[in-house]
């Protein structure tokens, strides 16, 4: 009897310890960003310069003074920072951001890149601009910063980026909303994916307040001189209610003029610089087209984007 009780206790303790380690192991692996830092044998003459620094959650404000809000809007989890130096004194800083999901990482990637950069075949997508490089793969954004544009530094950026990318095994997928942008004449590096008003405001400040109640949105520029914004809502009712509020805000704002309804689901205004803005609603979306475009073209885009 006593022996059976003793064995039961031992088995219970063993099971508890096993479950404890089983639950801790995936979490530890998931949160250990140091596993993505490149080995020195894989990056030629570049060596680690100092110890890595890690910031999680709200601690990001300690690292990025005045710029952490946008990362949190997109869904920031944590970042690891490691500096590298070569024998000639050249320096490169590597930041590996873990975001909430693939869409979050793609969004912050589009926020940090521009039409001026050179696209590279790394990760899901990567861009090099001067001595600054961004790479998106899965739910990670990798940012590498050199401190000059010399060939040695630029080559180092790409060498280190390849080593980091090889360690990230997950792959990402662009948000479905991005695929709704018309392909014809789209300047692909101009695409911006939003997950809140701060990202939108930094791209074009329609209003200081979050009039659109934006959670998911996309924007693309077109070669013919106009831009398309598309915002997504949970359902048609929410989209309709938001459109009504947006319509009122444009109409009453001192920043816009020449408000003109064009049917029940479309109106146009001009901003303070005379730029023409068309705003429409369909299903659970709000569509904005602004720039050099006439009303007939807007109608065509409005029709095609609903297909």
Name each model feature, range by range:
Residues 1-5:
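Positively charged n-region of N-terminal signal peptides that target proteins for export
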Residues 20-307:
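Soluble, non-membrane globular domain cores that form compact, hydrophobic packing
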Residues 8-17:
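Bacterial N-terminal signal peptides
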């Amino acid at each position: 009897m006593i022996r059976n009780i003793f064995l039961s206790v031992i088995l219970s303790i063993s099971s508890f310890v096993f479950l404890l380690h089983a639950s801790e192991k995936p979490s530890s692996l998931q949160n250990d960003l140091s596993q993505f830092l490149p080995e020195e044998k894989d990056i030629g003459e570049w060596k680690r310069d100092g110890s890595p620094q890690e910031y999680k959650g709200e601690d990001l404000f300690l690292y990025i003074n005045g710029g952490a809000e946008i990362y949190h809007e997109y869904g920031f989890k944590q970042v690891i920072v490691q500096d590298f130096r070569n024998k000639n004194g050249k320096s490169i800083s590597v930041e590996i951001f873990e975001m909430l999901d693939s869409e979050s990482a793609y969004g912050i990637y589009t926020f940090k890149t521009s039409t001026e950069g050179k696209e590279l075949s790394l990760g899901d997508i990567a861009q090099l601009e001067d001595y600054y490089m961004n790479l998106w793969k899965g739910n990670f954004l990798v940012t590498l910063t050199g401190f000059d544009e010399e060939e040695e530094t630029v080559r180092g950026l790409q060498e280190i980026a390849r080593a980091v990318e090889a360690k990230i095994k997950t792959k990402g997928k662009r948000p479905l909303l991005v695929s709704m942008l018309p392909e014809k004449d789209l300047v692909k590096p101009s695409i911006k994916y939003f997950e809140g008003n701060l990202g939108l405001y930094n791209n074009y400040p329609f209003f200081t307040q979050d009039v659109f109640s934006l959670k998911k949105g996309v924007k693309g520029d077109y070669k013919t001189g106009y831009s398309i914004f598309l915002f997504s809502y949970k359902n048609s009712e929410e989209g309709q209610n938001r459109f009504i509020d947006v319509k009122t805000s444009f109409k009453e704002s001192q920043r816009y003029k020449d408000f003109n309804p064009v049917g029940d689901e479309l109106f146009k205004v001009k901003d303070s610089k005379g730029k023409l803005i068309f705003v429409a609603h369909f299903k659970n979306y709000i569509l904005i087209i602004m720039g050099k475009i006439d009303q007939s073209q807007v109608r065509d885009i409005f029709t095609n984007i609903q297909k």
